[in-house]
């Protein structure tokens, strides 16, 4: 897959802000970031309020996703350009959602907000609304999603890639250092998992490293590209970034994101856990 199939540059984005069939969507960890300013014409998706089921711990389902996108003015024919802060980590999470519900016309803005702001490109404070559409999401593509039982059965068999920080992997922390240390009941990592922090795939300006650099990163860490691969983090957003790198940029086959991640696994009774590096 060519990079142009899944990524757009900031130059391209700025030249296509007014294109009728393109919808720019911002998705941030800090869901108030968009409210301060955003790329002109972009709409907002709140990863917690919009993409998570309000009752059970799971994604919104096919009907809910259809309603969400229809209400926000996105049609099945639109090309969606996702971007956000912190090297696009939650934008990559949303990208994986779109792929889960088989919306193929979706790309990431390489570098996200960070690159856009470093370039000094314009931002807007205008309120953006789009006319509602009748969006029809497809049934989820669970070939890109890993579930608990498959993960447990994959220990010492498939590639398990823990993309959290070394301190989370070793069990010193339960969550990134800037966040509350909560959600999972136990620290540590899944036995046989390789620790390759997600952020190593990005340059200082938030753009993705070259294919050659990325291939070397994962090969040097011992990842066997001939095996099936499951990536995980704490809640699935950082592992979505690595899923994007492995599948969409490097062309790995059979890569799944375990969105339950450590929040689920670290709270299970009786499953194997390892501490240390």
Swiss-Prot record:
UniProtKB keywords: Repeat, Transferase
Enzyme class: transferase
Record InterPro entries: Rhodanese-like_dom (IPR001763), Rhodanese-like_dom_sf (IPR036873), Thiosulfate_sulfurtransferase (IPR051126), Thiosulphate_STrfase_CS (IPR001307)
Gene3D superfamilies from the UniProt entry: Rhodanese-like domain
Binding-site list for substrate: 238
GO molecular function, a single term: thiosulfate-cyanide sulfurtransferase activity
Active site as annotated: 233 (cysteine persulfide intermediate)
Pfam families named among the record's database cross-references: Rhodanese
SMART domains listed in its UniProt record: RHOD
EC number(s) given by UniProt: 2.8.1.1
Catalytic activity: thiosulfate + hydrogen cyanide = thiocyanate + sulfite + 2 H(+)
Domain (Rhodanese): residue spans on this chain: 18-125, 154-274
Highest rank taxon of the organism: Bacteria
Domain notes: Contains two rhodanese domains with different primary structures but with near identical secondary structure conformations suggesting a common evolutionary origin. Only the C-terminal rhodanese domain contains the catalytic cysteine residue.
Cited function: May be a sulfotransferase involved in the formation of thiosulfate.
Name under which the protein is recorded: Putative thiosulfate sulfurtransferase
Natural source organism: Mycobacterium leprae (strain TN)
